[in-house]
Amino acid sequence: MLKDIHQHRILILDFGSQYAQLIARRVREIGVYCELMPCDIDEETIRDFNPHGIILSGGPETVTLSHTLRAPAFIFEIGCPVLGICYGMQTMAYQLGGKVNRTAKAEFGHAQLRVLNPAFLFDGIEDQVSPQGEPLLDVWMSHGDIVSELPPGFEATACTDNSPLAAMADFKRRFFGLQFHPEVTHTPQGHRILAHFVIHICQCIPNWTTKHIIEDSIRDIQEKVGKEQVIVGLSGGVDSAVTATLVHKAIGDQLVCVLVDTGLLRLNEVDEVLNVFQKHLGAKVICVDAKDRFMKALKGISDPEEKRKIAGEQFIRVFEEQAKKLNVKWLGQGTIYPDVIESAKTKTGKGHIIKTHHNVGGLPLNMELKLIEPLRELFKDEVRKLGLELGLPADLIYRHPFPGPGLAIRILGEVNAEYINILKQADAIFIEELKKSDYYHQVSQAFAVFMPLKSVGVKGDARHYGYIIALRAVKTVDFMTAQWADLPHEFLSKVSHRIVNEIKEVSRVVYDMTNKPPATIEWE
């Protein structure tokens, strides 16, 4: 009997925390489905979601100001367990009758937590033990406010030197608050603390497993599609590969794969993709030469959002034309959960678009194809697990992500054939050297960016004005946050030397040392 992977679910209310998506990843790792929603979501939506537990995220605001964000009051009245993290703890305390004040000394970074009452959340969990026999935990703090007075019915369950009320609980109503961040890796026991809340307190059954997700996806595809055909666009990336494999597993020969040669793919990528999918999928693959079409559509366009939307529209139009030839009604897309989150029009009721993904916000409103997105609920690492379970080669599964609009958004400003050719060569050199030096799988994503600016240099005995190439490499678990990769200077020097010597149009190479946030991983 197939498991209902959505039967037990956790709702995470986002107060604008940089770690909100990380909380969702941790809950998924525990094996329970969850969704992330803005903290001002309406009561009807929450009741329809019917969560087994609710987590209130941290946030950048202060509860001490009257106009800042609050949790929906009714969540404290429906008998559902609630866990407040950092700001989430503070707003829960304030809303239930406690007091919150600015702290005399803000806590940022490592702290040692002394557990006063281990019941429920901290049961059996410790990093060390104090001389008095109390459990001690290493935790990560990031706050300027503290709960100064507990709400009625609560007791202090942990403290630090700077936070006498570092954790609190109302055991009867199953309300819990943590001033620290259990979701980050700097809190070593954080996963176990969250598991105690999700499994023991909320009593969720961990049905969110790779095997069950595949079974559920196949059933869903079969029910939606019936006997109709599906087109899936291949890009060479893991998302489209897993999408195609899932759809093929569900409906077999009803799948037609389409590889659109936009002229914006990486060097030799068209041949590589055709080889992989004809060999491993055994599915029908149609390659459409759309280079001239994309270049014409992108001519004169320098705005990144416009480039993304144009790429999305051209992709869909190509697929629709192929679909009409084949009488296909469905388009399979490799949309994943971070695409959905980043393309949301608002965050916490007042956010801004981070960027429009060509397979989410960039789809034309008058699209004639019906859409099927089997990965829409999954994070990138979950997609990779699915791919391995489905038997795709590891080299493909762990290939670095590549944006749908391709090199169009790795060329700053307007796109033209000269810029594309230069960027393809520079990117290929960077990736080749990463693989030769065994750094490729030590970083999560790496690529080159073309800057349409000329910088003076010297080649031979003459002054030379050439273009600038930026190199970007990051390390990340979920692509929601990322750290720039501290690659050895000798390695970067070698890559730079090759690029400026092998590509005559380039005179300068720079390396991007910016984390996400504040930057995004892609430059556009």
From Swiss-Prot:
EC numbers: 6.3.5.2
Binding site for ATP: 235-241
UniProt entry keywords in alphabetical sequence: ATP-binding, Glutamine amidotransferase, GMP biosynthesis, Ligase, Nucleotide-binding, Purine biosynthesis
Reaction catalyzed: XMP + L-glutamine + ATP + H2O = GMP + L-glutamate + AMP + diphosphate + 2 H(+)
Recorded GO MF terms: ATP binding; GMP synthase activity
Cross-referenced InterPro entries: Class_I_gatase-like, GATASE, GMP_synth_C, GMP_synth_GATase, GMP_synthase, GMPS_ATP_PPase_dom, NAD/GMP_synthase, Rossmann-like_a/b/a_fold
Keyword hit for Ligase: yes
Pathway(s) per entry: Purine metabolism; GMP biosynthesis; GMP from XMP (L-Gln route): step 1/1
Protein name per Swiss-Prot or TrEMBL: GMP synthase [glutamine-hydrolyzing]
Originating species: Coxiella burnetii (strain CbuG_Q212)
Gene name, Swiss-Prot/TrEMBL: guaA
